[in-house]
From Swiss-Prot:
Pfam families: Cpn60_TCP1 (PF00118). NCBIfam families: GroEL, PRK00013.1, PRK12849.1, PRK12850.1, PRK12851.1. This is Chaperonin GroEL. One of its GO terms (biological process) is protein refolding. The lineage of its organism: Bacteria, Bacillati, Bacillota, Clostridia, Eubacteriales. Signal peptide: none annotated.
């Protein structure tokens, strides 16, 4: 495959054109008066969104050099989304500003390596200032504010704050599409897994078609039970106690299942059987989680335990268990609190060590089931198009909220960046080109406020000047068109999002400035295949 090569200024300008095309498409969404972008889809209705990373991911440019520039800035948005879950538009905007200001200086003959040094120095100082000015999230009200600003909707803010309050910081909040027009919150208390009863004859409430067991014993095993003789000794002990039983096993079939059903129908004793959740190694870990939560043991040949030798003290217990056709929910397991805390710590360490996003997600689900709970935000809307747009906004707001809980909040609307300029201005260096790098960041830090103002139809320079000359904490509320104390008014951003956006933008932009040569593949021009000749329409053989 033949390659095309560009050098120096020509290569940087070609890539900058791509950066500008992507950033200009993304930055129209910034701020409370930001607009939406419509993305064409090959199948179905177009997607309308104001989510920076979703827009960036859709952009592929025809010109190969421009596309390389666009892909570099796309990485800024993607990385910020991965780390903080929000702030992708701000990150893209900052990258564009640093590249634009940096290229002016490189074109004028400045050394890009020294400029890069100045950029790093200024970014480190700004990040330190952002961390210093952050305030810990304090209660439900702060959480609602963060979510409302991210989603540009106070209702969504309240919904997410309710969810966080109910499941705690360790809980899992998922976002699903609803079949109705309303957006609702559904909270599952206790540990729930997606396995239901093995026979409908096991239900205790025929109207709701579910089984509810109060203070039951819980037998956990990774074995398949098909012979009733294996569990007969423990069943006799439970009948004598007058208790109910939940069996969680790999499977229960044949004679064993039939005997349990017959005894339930006769009223001898109540037993509900469900399959163990998960598969393979994950199933073993989930059974162990349930055992720790309920204070029981997993009966497994791996640890030398046989079903026929089970005693009552090996069984778990819980305040209540609800089993439907699809799900089992264990409420208030009677396990030892210290052992549960140790298990939670172990899972948390595994989350930190794993690099797989899928494994991380599954571990977080297990952590939530042990430590908090699970909340589901069911997103409703009148049309499919509105539903997708609303779902994306709620996912962003949720990510912003989690980031705020981790590292606290700072004044929103780009105010935190303007406040960081004061510290950056104090920096100095003997080398003039390093000072240029510092000046580039000083100018780039104004860009978010400038763009928020532009999207509101206002002149950014005037607003920036007014904020700089105001006391600390004062910023510009673009929605109301007034200067106000951002923290007091609840216009806040997560410190983690603000920090990550700047760090990722500077990382990619400073690398961009040191580019001297671009190598791209020349696309093949395949000639259209010649049309096949039309066959004769002979009438041979006809009389």
């Amino acid at each position: 495959m033949a390659k095309s090569i560009l050098f120096g200024e020509e290569s940087r300008r070609a890539m900058q054109a791509g950066v500008d095309k992507l950033a200009n498409a993304v930055k129209v969404t910034l701020g409370p008066k930001g607009r939406n972008v419509v993305l064409d889809k090959k199948f179905g209705a177009p997607l309308i969104t104001n989510d920076g990373v979703t827009i960036a991911k859709e952009i592929e440019l025809e010109d190969m050099y421009e596309n390389m520039g666009a892909q570099l800035v796309k990485e800024v948005a993607t990385k910020t989304n991965d780390v903080a879950g929000d702030g992708t538009t701000t990150a893209t905007l900052l990258a564009q500003a640093i590249i634009r200001e940096g290229l002016k200086n490189v074109t004028a003959g400045a050394n890009p390596m020294l400029i890069r040094k100045g950029i790093k120095l200024a970014v480190d100082t700004a990040v330190e200032q952002i961390k210093k000015s952050s305030k810990q999230v304090d209660g439900k009200e702060d959480i609602a504010r963060v979510a409302a600003i991210s989603a540009a909707d106070p209702e969504i803010g309240k919904l997410i704050a309710d969810a966080m309050e109910k499941v705690g910081n360790e809980g899992v909040i998922t976002v699903e599409e609803s079949n109705t027009m309303a957006t609702e919150l559904e909270v599952v208390e206790g540990m729930q897994f997606d396995r239901g009863y093995l026979s409908p004859y096991m239900v205790t409430d025929a109207e709701k078609m579910e089984a509810v067991l109060e203070n039951p014993y819980i037998l956990l095993t990774d074995k398949k039970i098909s012979n009733i003789q294996e569990i007969l000794p423990i069943l006799e002990q439970i009948v004598q106690q007058g208790k109910k039983l939940l069996i969680i096993a790999e499977d229960i079939e044949g004679e064993a299942l039939a005997t349990l059903v017959v005894n339930k129908l006769r009223g001898t004793f109540t037993c509900v059987a469900v399959k163990a959740p998960g598969f393979g190694d994950r199933r073993k870990e989930m059974l162990r989680d349930i055992a720790i939560l309920t204070g029981g043991e997993v009966i497994s040949e791996e640890v030398g335990r046989e079903l026929k030798d089970v005693t009552l003290d090996m069984l778990g217990t819980a305040e209540s268990v609800k089993i439907s056709k699809e799900n089992t929910t264990i409420v208030n397991g009677k396990g030892n609190k210290e052992v549960i805390a140790d298990r939670v710590g172990q899972i948390r360490r595994q989350i930190e060590e794993t690099s797989s996003e899928f494994d991380k997600e599954k571990l977080q689900e297990r952590l939530a089931k042990l430590a908090g709970g699970v909340a589901v935000v069911k997103v409703g809307a009148a049309t499919e198009t509105e539903l997708k747009e609303r779902k994306l906004r709620i996912e962003d707001a949720l990510a912003a909220t989690k980031a705020a809980v981790e590292e606290g909040i700072v004044a929103g609307g780009g105010t935190a960046y303007l406040r960081a300029i004061k510290e950056v201005e104090k920096l100095t260096d003997d080398n003039a080109e390093v000072r240029l790098g510092i000046a580039i960041i000083r100018r780039a830090l104004e860009e978010p406020v400038r763009q928020i103002a532009a999207n509101a139809g206002l002149e950014g320079s005037v607003i920036i000047d007014k904020i700089k000359n105001s006391e600390d904490g004062i910023g510009f509320d673009a929605l109301e068109g007034e200067y106000t104390n951002m923290m007091q008014k609840g216009i806040v951003d997560p410190a983690k999002v603000t920090r990550s956006a700047l760090q990722n933008a500077a990382s990619v932009a400073s690398t961009f400035l040191t580019t001297e040569c671009v190598v791209a593949e020349i696309p093949e021009k395949n000639p259209m295949p010649a049309a096949p000749g039309m066959g004769g329409m002979g009438m041979d053989g006809m009389y």
